[in-house]
Regions:
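Charge-rich amphipathic alpha-helical interaction elements
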Residues: 1-148
Length: 148
């Protein structure tokens, strides 16, 4: 019984670790989604800017407007490259935290299984002991009854 109490305390610690890992994983998912959404919005802006630039090329537009639009597109490209790196980092972090969460879950399940097995063994030992006691009582009663 004392063994299962100790194991239950360890299980509680593992459950706490799992909750922390789950929270960290959720935060990493949120960060990834936020960064990916920013990248998506920036890609949409770039696409629209390129359409405006292409339209400006076909129409009679001043050279300054074309340079300005081209510079804007280059600025967007630089920002997109930076955000792509951020998305990759966020994805890597998210995958690492998912792995930690999986490991924490497996550890927790191990202790649950060990506790379950120990309790079953304990119950079987108690039943065996109870049966032996009942057999002993029956023999004692039989012998007492026979001696009368």
């Amino acid at each position: 019984m004392a063994e299962t109490v100790v194991l239950s305390k360890i299980l509680h610690i593992r459950e706490t670790e799992k909750k922390h890992a789950q929270k960290a994983y959720q935060q990493s998912i949120d960060l990834f989604e936020k960064t990916a959404t920013q990248l998506y919005e920036l890609l949409k802006k770039k696409e629209m800017a390129e359409e405006v630039y292409e339209t400006a090329l076909t129409e009679s537009t001043t050279l300054d407007k074309l340079k300005e639009q081209f510079t804007y597109i280059e600025h967007l490209n630089n920002h997109i490259m930076h955000l792509q790196e951020e998305v990759q980092k966020a994805r890597f972090d998210m995958e690492a935290k998912q792995s930690k969460l999986t490991d924490a879950h497996v550890e927790m399940k191990k202790y649950e299984k060990i506790i379950e097995t120990r309790k079953k063994d304990e119950a079987a030992a108690n039943r065996k002991k109870e049966k032996a006691t009942m057999d002993e009582v029956s023999i004692y009663q039989f012998l007492n009854h026979k001696n009368r």
